[in-house]
Amino acid sequence: MQVKLKVLLIGSGGRESAIAFYLRKSVLLSELKVFPGNGGFPDQELLPPDSFQVLDKNSVQSFLKQNPFDLIVVGPEDPLVAGFADWAAELNIPVFGPDSFCAQVEGSKDFAKSLMTEAKIPTAEYKTFSEYSDSLKYLESKSIPIVIKADGLAAGKGVTVATSKEMAQTALKEIFKDKKFGSSGNQVVIEEFMEGQEASIFAISDGDSYFLLPAAQDHKRAFDGDQGPNTGGMGAYCPAPVISESILQKVKEQIFDPMFDLFRKKGHPYRGLLYAGLMISPNGEPKVVEFNCRFGDPETQCVLAMLDGDLLELLYRASTGKIKGVQAAVKKGAAVVVVLAAQGYPDFYEKNIPLNLPETSGQNVHLFHAGTLKKDGKVFSSGGRILGIVAQGADLKSSVDQAYSFLEKIQAPKTFYRKDIGYRAL
């Protein structure tokens, strides 16, 4: 490809820091702008904080008319569910990310489950409720453990794996009565508990063709040994050995092929990234836990470390309908990301923690900012997940060792991290 591209990246997390890091390496990049960004981005890449409102169509379109871009890469799910890709398409600007119809696959658990039923995609049995009393009645007839999910977006925290009836009842009360997730809890999906190992697989699609990135395994629970509350993710590694070649074939044939076919049939070819969160049963059968309409975080940070090629070219081709025949070259070895989080995360957590960060240059380690901000040249925490430390090496053990030895050099009071990331594959 002989084009030079001015790119706008939307988002502020570790995922966006990683995407930006690999976009900068592209020979196709003429200029990168980021909105709203975080404390790790160079000032010249950041748009002013009042540039536009990312969930407001008029605001977005008026900004884009005055500031044209060749490609927009949308990191988080909220703008996609709101219609960001549709708004940019009206101005003929390519977007890496699906339209608002397709983005409902993450925006509504009920929508996703109904699509899976229609496409005969393997997933847990479920029922959707809009009335508290009906959900409680249904719960009585079910065995434990059972999974309670708020229907709408809840930043990865709307799911409870209930190990007792009381826990399930509390989860339903919090969603329906206490409005813990606001309108995202107007409906609740109750589904059967699935046994097995989880894995994440990302597919990049141009609406017609698609290819898969290497599988990763995320660690959702806050504490070592998979204890504690669910979080947005405390670390991940890639590739995930639980996904063998034969399982990968099943994932393509039973999950991605029928899903992309169904979107085309509905008149909405899926352009962008479709993330399948999978449960692999003990006998090697993949089932879908959830779909997301964007790169996962933190998995993206280690998956992109394994890509051997031009990320910008891949994203631009996907956004302009030109990925037929393209394959993502993958490095040998393994990569890991470990998340440094604020004490108290995922509930009420410390903020404004001063961060003293060592240099990473000359090492196979990258430090990706997430919940950080810059004040007077110094970096402070601003979110629950503060940093992602990524290492890529000859094998998982060497990558894990590098990541943890770097983490020990970071001076940040009132923070914590899991010390067992990758344990299932070590």
From Swiss-Prot:
CC cofactor: Mg(2+); Mn(2+)
Q: Which domain of life is it from?
A: Bacteria
Q: Which residues form the ATP-grasp domain?
A: 113-320
**Enzyme Commission identifier(s):** 6.3.4.13
GO MF, one example: ATP binding
What protein family does this chain belong to? Belongs to the GARS family.
Q: What is this protein called?
A: Phosphoribosylamine--glycine ligase
Q: Which organism is it from?
A: Leptospira interrogans serogroup Icterohaemorrhagiae serovar Lai (strain 56601)
